[in-house]
Curated annotation (Swiss-Prot):
Belongs to the TRAFAC class myosin-kinesin ATPase superfamily. Myosin family. CDD domains: MYSc_class_II. Residues 75-791 form the Myosin motor domain. One of its GO terms (biological process) is mitotic cytokinesis. Residues 629-641 have a biased composition (Polar residues). This is Myosin-1.
């Protein structure tokens, strides 16, 4: 992310700072300086930091390091992708602000960034879980819906909820990737996700009642949660950064069933830190399990494990670790939690003992010490018996395996002696391997116990893995972690790329897509590529295999392969170090110890010893790979499966290769899921609350890929805002110079159009923003600029507003003081006058005294009357109160009755609850039975397996016995042989003795032989003794084996007996269950029959819904038509108003121009008359001729292209068809080609869609420009016509040149001028005629194209070979070959189209759209030519006016002109007739060709003959073209000669030439037709095709009729438009009149206002006099107000009673609904009562009818309730009216005397009494209606009780039917929504087609107007000629 993003001067920016990382400053200016190191020029910003008070403190910063600050409206934004300036300091600032407010979660596009708060926050309670889980009920996924106003704040629960919702809605696997540094909170967040998923699937205890089935689910979820303490004990350790740091990565799969409930879990683990077992940092600890084991076990248990003490210092692998007390870690409590978790998950006591035994072994191995007797051989210093007993191996074997391991060298075994260092290395490797294998075993056992066994539908995977690591010393482990993070970042980039692409496609926005995943591929290849060149890890694997390899040799190889070969690799300054460029930054690695870490071997001798251990756990852990079935995690992570190749089949695998395999499987799993990303961040290394280390967090943001994601977002349009929000926020920025009325007139109903108006007024570059379908997309920084503009504008508005307010307050004060002064003057004058009259006038004194006495008698009578009336009113009030009491009593009765009904309802509810409990019991019993059945089946299977195993063991034992017996026999045979040999030897001895006695002479020889024989005897005796010992041992073994066999046989017999008894019980139970099953099946069949009946009723409902849909569609169409017509009329009104103003201004300009022009013409008339005539004539005629030739050539070119394209495509298609038909392919080749074509087709369709979109945009732009050009040319023509009229009028009025001078001119110059004029006029007429012909040709071409369209559609309907896919491919091919075809078509001659196949016709159908566009382009050129012609006409009219002044012989010229005009008209008519005949012949010819094309499929056998016909037609076409060119040349020659000859000769020659041309054309066409007929007669009889030709002609006539009807419709529409414009103008005039009238009324009202103000002044004086009287009346008013308050309280009580009754009604309705819902749970009880199945159908119908009746009645009750509410509102209104009347009374009291006030008050009281009586009467009515309602409810209740009793008997069918109906209704709703979408699409298409039709109509009207203007021009010329005659 680079800086300098549109930074301008005086702008607040971020600049880098050493302490604070980034600081705010004000950019004062920019400058350019040279860099000292590079010598290049750099732009530098001069910034004033805001934190410094000194003004002179300025800092120079490179502009690339300057970043703009976001407006304050974007502070603490929840999604950082919404920041309009996306840069590092803005992201840091936003996170810091949120972190200070304990907002630890923030979205960053697809990421959720989570910062560790280091203290407990109330964010994970049950309320929060309910809030996020119930979110989708209120709104549809707040995070996805960006425009929702009820967005919930970012949270880890929101990610979990989104994953869960996607799992249910999409049915796709989900994954949540949680990464970050150690201590950032990865494990805690994964725990929270697990907690959330477990709670929403099982339900919290507060919300869900414990049912028998739910407890199992809760225990299963508890198992998943309890796996965390086990993994933390064995996989977590205390580090410098984190007290509970996970030292391994894990991928937890939480499996769900089809109902969305947790069905199982599976854990896979990665990269366990084995080196920690042997060596730790002094400030860190080993794994928790070692400390928990020593502190948690009893002394006896420790002794059993051969552990002598609890002290950590007594164990060498723990003595160097941190031994301080760690806050938050209690080893004893954690060990208890571990034991409970192991028990909950399902570990047996033996398994737990084995696990602890392995941990103890590792502790004991660490304490082994060595004594080196020699340098080469080591020996143990301490006793090893405890280790060997725990391992279950012989002590001597263990010593030899460690100190003198045996290895195979060739065919011999060789022992190698090890020194103390080497032996220690072997022991360390053993402890590492033991712990790793133990960890794998524990994970396997957890997975085994968490496997539910049933089928799982989908899963949510939680990946908790270490984030990117950059330390001071980075080794092999950091490379593996960073490599995985690099791959994960690439995965994220690809995922983000796909989402961006889909978003832009959905919003219909053009964007050049970039694959961001390729950015990281170089680094990944550098690490993993197998070459060439070979990556880092494969090189390490090669070195690991080679003998005598070292870290230095690996380093030298690495440098030689990668140094200066990759931009991502650098050589380090450190020894044996190198630098890799990752996405997060450069990392320096050292290769020390990499080979040993990659291998980590155990010798074969030790492995074989451990695999044959007597300890079960050790033998299992070191079992060969072929014999053990382990999970993926253990298979991937157990390190030493490569040993003892002779004994096992596995090969040597290094750590890096296993890690790569792990990574591939992980990424494949993630790729098949929908991923969600969580990035955890550690705020500081001190573990303090609310300390925000900016530099540390910035490094983590880089490492976590957050800034990388923001960088990718900047490439597109990161800021997205809804239309309505944008319009409301930035509407104020509309420019002030354009009035608000014009802007409001532009505003429309759709906010999208309003936003478009606003954006155009803001003059933003279109590259900066894009308009989507639902929202606006902005580049980074655009919204910030708009916010600044908005702030500036609001500031200006506020300044103006404050100024106006202040002015208003000052003016108000001044006027108030002036009024005071005036009032005081008036009062002073009145008092002076009063005093003067009292003093001076005695009559006035007499009047003052007598006046009060006169009115006293009248007052007495009035007071009596008033008293009587008051008494009457009091009596009336008492009667009203009595009635009121009576009504209240009735009300209480009704309330009591309602309470009784409620009690009845409660009783019914209790009954329902009992039934529900029964149902639940039945359900639970059925579930338990089913489970027992399943258990029995499983037990049966197990027994059968055990039986088979026992049988196998017996057979093996028999075989062994037989083998032993055979060996015994063999040994006995050998004994017998030895006995026989012994006997023989004895015989030999006896013989020898005889020989000795006989032969004493040979004693020496005999002695020697004797000695030899004695030796042999001894030897034989030894052999005999050994053999006897062997026989004894064999006999002992035989006896022991026989005893063992006997014991085993006894136990087997017992087991067999038990199994047989179990089997018998199972068989009986099985038979019972089968019988029950059959009963259930019978009941099911009955239910299915009833379901069929309900389905028939559903079909009827569907038909009704379809009818409703049709009605809706018609209404929507009518509404859309009305809206569109209204919009058009309003738009046209606006345009007409604008045009009126423009015409007025143009008229004034024309007047001024004309006055100037008149002055100039008077001065330069005589000078330039002759020269202008000659020069202009020549130049204009040449220009017009050139343009005419261009127009003709263009028309020819179009015709050639249309014919040529069709011929070419036909030939290609015929060749293809013949090739396909002639060469049959094998099946295999066809299949291969089919697949290849499929692949090609997919690629072509993608390209096609992109090109179609581009083409649509281009077409829309072209149409817009066309309409603008047409409108501008039309306006220009109107202005020119007005100019001509004005000029004619002025010239007629001002005859400046005298007639005498013109008559007296010499006659010599007249003939030349006459000839010139004649030439000019003839040339102009000829050019006009040619233009008419060309325009008609254009119209003919368009008509031909439309006819082709219609025919192609019909042929398409008839032909079965074509398809939409072929059309798309052919359309694309024709699009790509347009350019080449254009070049070819210019050179190619016209070809006959008689032999075109149908396939090519279909192709032409698609290519016609392209030609339509080209025709539009040529139309535009025609428009331009027409404008030029109009200009020439204007200039010619000027010339004719000039020539009028020099009319010496006008009579002769006018006669000649008239004659010529007549001749020309006659020739034009003839030409028109000829052209019409030619057109008809052309149409006939084209019809014939189309007929032949339609019959091409039947004529495939005669292709060769048709090719010959094509060649003939080509020749004929070339001849026709030549003849046409010759005719054109002849026409030109004739036209030149016509000017020289007489008028009669000209006429004759023209007619003859035209006749000859027509005859030639007719002959050519007749020859062509004859030739074609001959060809066709040779092929097939033409009689077959005559009918088809007639049919096609009829279709053509129909299309022509349709065109005429359309024209008529266009004319009517135009007439309606004109009438509407006239009406609107009339209305406008009426409105203006009304305006004048209202202005007059306002003036009158102002005058009246002045008079009222004077009257008010007089009244004010009276008011002061009457204040005293008012005070006396206040007491009486207070009493009346009290009465009124009492009445109001009565009213309120009655309204409360009404509300209570309404509430009771609503509660009753709700209870009824609940009753209907709870009836669904009565399945099992109803199944027991299936005897009454015969009455089910009738009862269901009656229930439906009654339910419908109840619904209607409830609706009536609701309506009555609404009426009551409305009446209540009327009462409230009356109350307000009474209050107003009171106010009026106060005012009247101030105005009149006391007596008048009393009278008015009495009248008002009478009115009030009458109103009260009316109200009371109405309340009586209401009470009666309520009583009726209560009675009806009682009756309903009784009916409902009856109905419920019936429903309790048989309701199961109805329930199932309703469920199915609901499902079908939901399907129907989906179908309706799809239909609505299709309707919307069709409406859009309809509107687009209407727009097209309107455009065509506009074009037609334009051409009509052009034609009319030309006709008017010709008529004007005629009139001018006539005037010239008159003047002559």
């Amino acid at each position: 992310m680079t800086g300098g993003q549109s930074c301008s001067s005086n702008m607040i920016v971020w600049i880098p700072d050493e302490k604070e990382v980034f600081v705010k400053g004000e950019l004062m200016s920019t400058d350019i300086n040279k860099n000292k190191f590079t010598g290049q020029e750099e732009q530098i910003g001069i910034v004033h930091p805001l934190d410094s008070t000194e003004v002179s403190n300025l800092v120079q910063v490179r502009i690339s390091d300057v970043f703009p600050v976001n407006p304050s409206t974007f502070d603490k934004v929840e999604n950082m992708s919404e920041l309009t300036h996306l840069n590092e300091p803005s992201v840091l600032y936003n996170l810091e602000k949120r972190y200070d407010c304990d907002l630890i979660y923030t979205y960053s596009g697809l990421f959720l960034v989570a910062i560790n708060p280091y203290h407990n926050l109330n964010l994970y309670s049950e309320d929060h879980i309910n809030l996020y889980h119930n979110k989708h009920n209120r709104l549809s996924k707040s995070r996805l819906d960006e425009n929702s106003h009820e967005k919930l704040p970012p949270h880890i629960f929101a990610i979990a909820e989104e994953a869960y919702e996607n799992l249910l809605s999409e049915g796709k696997d989900q994954s949540i990737l949680v990464t970050g540094e150690s201590g950032a909170g990865k494990t805690e967040n994964t725990k929270k996700i697990l907690q959330y998923l477990a709670s929403i699937t099982s339900g919290s205890p507060s919300n869900i009642a414990p049912v028998s089935g739910s407890s199992i689910v809760e225990s299963f979820e508890m198992k998943i949660l309890q796996s965390n303490p086990i993994l933390e004990s064995f996989g977590n350790a205390q580090t410098v950064r984190n007290n509970n740091s996970s030292r391994f990565g894990k991928f937890i799969k939480i499996e769900f069933n089809e109902h969305g409930m947790i069905n199982g879990a599976h854990i896979e683990w990665y990269l366990l830190e084995k080196s920690r077992i042997v060596h730790q940092n002094s400030k860190e600890r080993n794994y928790h399990i070692f400390y928990q084991l020593l502190s948690g076990l009893d002394d006896s248990e420790l002794k059993n494990l051969r552990l002598k003490s609890r002290n950590v210092k007594d164990y060498k692998i723990l003595s160097n670790s941190n031994q301080d007390i760690i806050p938050g870690i209690n080893d004893v409590e954690n060990f208890k939690e571990l034991l409970s978790a192991l028990n909950i998950i399902g570990f047996s006591k033996d398994q737990i003992r084995w696990i602890f035994q392995v941990v103890a072994i590792i502790l004991l191995i660490g304490n082994i010490e060595f004594v080196s007797d020699r340098a080469e051989q080591a020996s143990f210093k301490n006793d090893v018996s405890a280790i060997c007993s725990n391992l279950g191996v012989d002590e001597k074997d263990f010593q030899t395996a460690i100190l003198r391991p045996r290895s195979k060298a060739g065919k011999e075994w060789v022992s190698q002696s090890k020194n103390s260092q080497q032996a220690k290395f072997i022991l360390n490797a053993l402890s590492r391997n033991l712990y790793e294998r133990l960890f794998g075993y524990i994970v396997d056992m957890i997975n085994k116990n968490l496997d539910h066994g049933s089928a799982t539908l989908n899963y949510i995977g939680l990946l908790d893995i270490a984030g990117f690591e950059i330390f001071e010393n980075n080794s092999f482990e950091q490379l593996c972690i960073n490599y995985t993070n690099e791959k994960l970042q690439q995965f994220f980039n690809n995922h983000m790329f796909v989402l961006e692409q889909s978003e832009y496609l959905k919003e219909n926005i053009q964007w050049d897509y970039i694959d961001y995943g390729k950015d990281l591929q170089l680094t990944i290849d550098l690490i993993e590529s197998k070459g060439p060149p070979t990556g880092v890890l494969p090189l390490l694997d090669e070195e690991a295999v080679l003998p005598k390899s070292t870290d230095e040799s690996f380093y030298s190889k690495l440098i030689s392969t990668w140094d200066q070969n990759s931009s991502k690799f650098k050589r380090s300054r450190l020894k044996n170090g190198f630098i890799l460029k990752h996405y997060a930054g450069d990392v320096e690695y050292t290769v020390e110890g990499w080979l040993s870490k990659n291998k980590d071997p155990l010798n074969d001798n030790l492995l074989s010893l451990l695999s044959s251990s007597q300890n079960d756990i050790i033998s299992k852990l070191f079992q060969p790979e072929g014999e053990k079935s382990s999970s993926a995690g253990v298979e991937a992570n157990i390190s030493n499966q490569e040993v003892k190749k002779s004994a096992r089949t596995s090969t040597f695998k290094t750590t890096s290769s296993r890690h790569r395999e792990q990574q591939i499987t992980l990424l494949n799993q993630l790729a098949s899921t929908h991923p969600h990303f969580v990035r955890c961040i550690i705020p500081n290394n001190v573990k303090k609350v609310k300390t925000f280390n900016r530099r540390l967090i910035l490094d983590q943001l880089r490492c976590n890929g957050v800034l990388e994601g923001i960088r990718l977002a900047r490439e597109g349009y990161p800021n997205r805002i809804a239309f309505q929000e944008f319009f409301q926020r930035y509407r104020i920025l509309y420019p002030e110079n354009s009035t608000t009325t014009t802007f409001s007139s532009k505003l429309k109903a759709s906010t999208k159009q309003n936003c478009e108006f606003l954006l155009t007024s803001l003059q933003l570059d279109t590259k900066v923003y894009k308009i989507g379908n639902t929202k606006l997309f902005f580049k980074a920084g655009v919204l910030a600029d708009l916010e600044k503009q908005k702030d500036v504008k609001l500031n200006n508005i506020m300044i103006k507003l404050t100024a106006t307010i202040r002015g208003y307050t000052v003016r108000k004060e001044i006027t108030y003081h002036l009024q005071k002064l005036k009032k005081t003057r008036v009062i002073g004058n009145t008092f002076r006058l009063y005093n003067r009259l009292v003093k001076e006038d005695p009559w006035f004194n007499l009047f003052i005294r007598i006046k009060p006495l006169l009115t006293s008698s009248n007052d007495m009578t009035r007071t009596k009357k008033f008293n009587e009336q008051i008494n009457k009113l009091k009596n009336d009030l008492q009667e009203m109160e009595s009635k009121k009491k009576f009504l209240e009593e009735k009300n209480q009765k009704t309330v009591n009755e309602l309470e009784n009904t409620q009690d009845l309802l409660n009783q019914e509810k209790e009954n329902l609850r009992k039934n529900e409990s029964l149902l639940n019991r039945v359900k639970t019993s059925s579930e338990t039975l089913q489970k027992q059945f399943d258990d029995l089946v499983s037990e049966k299977d197990e027994i059968s397996r055990e039986k088979l195993e026992v049988a196998q063991n017996l057979e093996e034992a028999h075989q062994k016995i037989q083998g032993l017996q055979e060996t015994i026999r063999e040994r006995e045979a050998t004994l017998e042989k030895l006995h026989s040999k012994n006997n023989e030897l004895i015989k030999q001895i006896s013989d020898l003795n005889c020989d000795i006695s006989k032969e004493q002479s040979s004693q020496s020889l005999i002695k020697e032989s004797k000695l030899k024989l004695e030796n042999e005897i001894k030897r034989l005796k030894d052999v005999i003794n050994s053999k006897e010992e062997e026989i004894k041992s064999f006999n002992d073994k035989l006896s022991s084996s026989e005893e063992d066999l006997d014991i085993k046989l006894v136990t087997l017999e017992k087991n067999c007996n038990i199994a047989m008894s179990r089997l018998q019980s199972l068989v009986t139970e099985n038979s019972d269950l089968r019988s029950k099953n059959e009963n259930f099946k019978k009941e099911k069949a009955a239910l299915n029959n009833q379901l069929k009946n309900k389905e028939s009723e559903l079909l009827k409902m569907k038909e009704k819904i379809d009818n409703h849909k049709k009605e809706l569609a018609t209404f929507s169409k009518q509404r859309d038509d009305a809206v569109s017509e209204h919009g058009k009329i309003t738009a046209e009104l606006k345009e007409t108003r604008i045009q009126l103003t423009e015409y007025k201004s143009n008229y004034q300009k024309i007047k001024e121009e004309y006055s100037n022009f008149q002055r100039e013409t008077k001065e330069q008339e005589q000078k330039k008359r002759n020269s202008l005539v000659e020069s202009l004539n020549d130049s204009k005629i040449k220009e017009l001729e050139a343009r005419l030739s261009q127009e003709i050539s263009l028309n020819q070119y179009l015709n050639k292209r249309i014919s040529g394209n069709s011929v070419e495509t036909n030939i290609s298609s015929t060749r293809r068809s013949t090739s396909y038909s002639d060469d049959p392919l094998d099946k295999e080749d066809i299949i291969k080609k089919y697949y290849d074509l499929q692949l090609a087709f997919t690629e072509i369709t993608r390209n096609l869609e992109n090109e179609i979109e581009e083409k649509k945009n281009l077409i829309s732009r072209l149409r817009f420009t066309e309409t603008r050009l047409a409108s501008s040319s039309f306006e220009d023509q109107k202005i020119k016509a007005q100019m001509k009229k004005l000029k004619k009028l002025i010239q007629d009025m001002d005859p400046s040149i005298p007639l005498d001078s013109i008559l007296n001119e010499p006659l010599d110059n007249c003939p030349d001028k006459e000839s010139d004029i004649n030439k000019l006029m003839l040339e102009v007429d000829y050019l006009k005629r040619q233009l008419d012909i060309e325009t008609r040709a254009h119209y003919d071409a368009e008509n031909a194209i439309s006819a082709l369209h219609s025919k192609f559609r019909k042929i398409q309907g008839e032909s079965s070979l074509s398809s939409s896919d072929i059309y798309k491919l052919k359309f694309e091919a024709s699009e790509e070959r347009v350019k080449s075809l254009e070049d070819k078509l210019k050179t190619m001659p016209l070809r006959d189209r008689t032999n075109l196949p149908v396939g090519d016709i279909i192709k032409n159908r698609d290519s016609i759209s392209k030609y339509e566009e080209e025709i539009r382009y040529y139309k535009l050129e025609n428009y331009k030519l027409q404008e030029i012609l109009n200009e020439s006409n204007g200039k010619l009219s000027q010339l004719t006016l000039d020539l009028r002044q020099s009319k010496s012989k006008e009579a002769l010229l006018s006669e000649q002109l008239d004659r010529l005009q007549k001749d020309l008209e006659s020739t034009e008519r003839q030409k028109e007739l000829l052209s019409s005949t030619i057109k008809q012949q052309k149409q006939q010819f084209e019809n014939c060709m189309d007929d032949l094309q339609g019959n091409e499929l039947r004529l495939r056998e005669h292709i060769h003959a048709l090719k010959q016909a094509e060649e003939d037609v080509k020749n004929m076409a070339s001849i026709i073209e030549k003849l046409k060119t010759q005719n054109k040349q002849k026409e030109k020659l004739i036209w030149e000669r016509e000017m020289e000859r007489n008028d009669s000769d000209m006429q004759l020659q023209e007619t003859l030439l035209e006749l000859k041309r027509v005859q030639d054309v007719k002959k050519i066409l007749s020859d062509d037709l004859a030739h074609l007929k001959e060809r066709l007669s040779a092929v097939e009889d033409r009689s077959q095709y005559t009918d088809e030709i007639n049919r096609l002609k009829e279709e053509l006539n129909c299309s022509l009729k349709a065109e005429t009807n359309l024209k008529k419709e266009f004319a009517t529409l135009k007439y309606k438009l004109e009438t509407s414009t006239n009406d609107s103008e009339a209305k406008i005039s009426d409105l203006l009149k009304q305006l004048d009238h209202y202005t007059k009324v306002v003036e009158m009202l102002n005058n009246e206002k002045d008079a009222i103000s004077l009257a008010e002044k007089e009244l004010y004086q009276k008011y002061e006099a009457l204040n005293t009287e008012c005070e006396s009346l206040k007491g009486k008013i207070v009493s009346l107000t009290k009465i009124k308050q009492e009445l109001e309280s009565d009213l309120n009580q009655k309204t409360d009673a009404l509300q209570i009754s309404n509430a009771a009604l609503s509660s009753s309705t709700q209870k009824n609904k609940e009753i209907t819902e709870k009836i669904k749970y009565l399945e099992e009880t109803l199944q027991l009562q299936m005897e009454q199945n015969s009455r089910n159908g009738e009862l269901v119908k009656t229930l439906q009818a009654s339910c419908n009746g109840y619904k209607d009645k409830f609706d009536d009750e609701k309506q009555k309730n609404i009426d009551l509410y409305e009446e209540n509102q009327t009462l409230q209104k009356l109350n307000t009216d009474l209050q107003l009347q009171l106010k009026n009374l106060h005012e009247r009291l101030s105005d009149t005397t006391e007596k008048n006030a009393w009278l008015s008050k009495i009248h008002e009281l009478e009115n009030m009494v009458s109103l009260e009586t009316d109200l009371k009467y109405e309340e009586m009515k209401k009470n009666k209606s309520l009583e009726r309602a209560v009675e009806e409810l009682q009756t309903k209740n009784s009916q409902q009780t009856d109905v419920i009793e019936l429903a309790n008997k048989n309701r199961s069918e109805f329930e199932e039917a309703t469920l199915k109906y609901e499902a079908q209704i939901s399907d129907l709703e989906k179908y309706i929504s799809q239909q609505e979408l299709e309707m919307k699409k069709s409406i859009r298409d309809n509107s687009s087609y209407r727009d097209k039709v309107q455009e065509m109509a506009q074009e037609i009207e334009f051409w009509k107007s052009r034609y009319e203007s030309t006709m008017i021009g010709s008529k004007n010329i005629d009139s001018n000629n006539a005037q010239s005659k008159i003047f002559s």
